[in-house]
């Protein structure tokens, strides 16, 4: 089997994470005997693929059609693997193309693509490099660290008031509350339940885009969850790294708290900071049936983890091997429980990550899926 990995366009590469994933997966393919190479998204891409055809192309977050509506997979007649590691709302158009194989990092995301018509969908959680080493430093350089975009909930709600009818606003507010109160409900399902209970009809939506509504809903959920966590630290010092998509950022929204706000940093620095920290705070309330790579990075390095609810993590690691701040009366108790977690348990979850959640494992799982899919 031969798979060509295509780097994302520069404007979508973010802080280097997609490029890093691409190189890690390419290395993993080589280690399991799959022929692969990395290609730039240049003007020569199509001719390169036609001249030396792989069995599949692969790109993190997929390749959408060009401005003229043409799909790369159709132009070169090669199936495309769209490995979605960000919110699915931006990429649901991929479900329309039958030559796309869609990989998602959350089972809820997979179900959403299937509802939009995708026929070939594979669930593979985030992963880490096998080279991550268990450090568990006695005197780490950083205390607790948090990485994440700042979402100003008030700004989101003001945009709803400006752009949506009262009924649509009520549906979105109710959906956000439902998704935050019941961590087993995926935000799309919360939206559908809320729309049904409020009697919202397709006619009332008019020309409103469902993916745009879902993205706005997800942003509100993420914003509320992150502010709940970071505003309830009660003196626990935390270094917060992240940009804002609104006028107000972390510095203004967390003024008076015990956090130290930093600019967003590139992915290589994120990994380095995690390994030099006491622990990682993780707020990903829209990933309920999967896991973010920050969690695996922290576990593999032997540092602490306090995270939002994840059914997947509970099933993988059990409730006594990491701590969820929604489980306890306050985030402080989750901090204390995680800091008191024994070194043997931290070593155990490190071994579990290295055994089950590396890029080599994901490469093996993806190849196994593709072989079954071809039959």
Predicted regions and their residues:
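Catalytic binding pocket for nucleotide-activated donors in carbohydrate/polymer assembly enzymes
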Residues: 4-16, 20-33, 37-41, 96, ...
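Active-site proximal beta-strand in glycosyltransferases
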Residues: 72-87, 102-104, 126
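Short N-terminal targeting/anchoring amphipathic segment
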Residues: 49-63
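Structural motif
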Residues: 55-58, 79, 101, 279, ...
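Nucleotide-sugar donor-binding catalytic core of glycosyltransferases
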Residues: 8-9, 17, 21, 119-120, ...
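A conserved, positively charged/aromatic
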Residues: 91-105, 114-115
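An aromatic- and histidine-rich active-site surface loop
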Residues: 60-74
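Structural alpha-helical scaffold elements that stabilize or flank donor/cofactor-binding regions
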Residues: 50, 72, 95-96, 232, ...
């Amino acid at each position: 089997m031969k798979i060509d990995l295509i780097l994302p366009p520069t404007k979508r590469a973010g802080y280097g994470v997609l490029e890093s994933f691409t190189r890690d997966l390419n290395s993993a393919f080589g280690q399991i005997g799959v022929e692969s190479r990395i290609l730039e998204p240049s003007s020569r891409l199509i001719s390169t693929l036609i001249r030396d055809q792989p069995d599949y192309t692969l790109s993190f977050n997929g390749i959408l059609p060009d401005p003229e509506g043409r799909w790369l997979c159709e132009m070169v007649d090669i199936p495309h693997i769209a490995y979605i590691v960000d919110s699915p709302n931006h990429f649901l158009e991929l479900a329309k193309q039958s030559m796309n194989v869609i990989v998602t990092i959350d089972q809820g995301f997979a179900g959403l693509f299937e509802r939009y018509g995708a026929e070939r969908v594979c669930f593979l959680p985030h992963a880490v490099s096998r080279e991550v080493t268990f450090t568990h430093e006695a005197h780490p350089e950083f205390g607790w660290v948090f990485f994440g975009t700042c979402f100003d909930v008030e700004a989101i709600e003001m945009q709803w008031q400006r752009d949506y009818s009262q009924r649509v606003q009520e549906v979105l507010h109710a959906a956000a509350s439902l998704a935050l109160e019941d961590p087993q409900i995926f935000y799309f399902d919360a939206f559908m339940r809320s729309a049904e209970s409020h009697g919202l009809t397709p006619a009332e939506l008019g020309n409103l885009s469902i993916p745009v509504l879902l993205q706005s809903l997800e942003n509100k959920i993420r914003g509320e969850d992150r502010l709940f966590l970071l505003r309830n630290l009660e003196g626990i010092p935390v270094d917060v790294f992240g940009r804002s998509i609104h006028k107000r950022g972390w510095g203004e929204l967390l003024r008076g708290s015990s956090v130290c706000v930093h600019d967003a940093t590139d992915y290589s620095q994120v990994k380095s900071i995690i390994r030099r920290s006491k622990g990682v705070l993780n707020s990903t309330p829209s990933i309920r049936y999967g896991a973010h790579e920050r969690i695996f990075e922290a576990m593999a390095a032997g540092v602490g983890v306090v995270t939002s609810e994840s059914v997947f993590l509970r099933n993988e690691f059990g409730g006594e091997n990491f701590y969820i701040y929604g489980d306890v009366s306050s985030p402080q108790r989750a901090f204390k429980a995680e800091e008191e977690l024994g070194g043997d348990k931290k070593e155990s979850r490190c071994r579990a990550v290295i055994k089950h959640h590396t890029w080599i494992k994901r490469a093996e799982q993806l190849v196994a899926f593709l072989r079954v899919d071809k039959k």
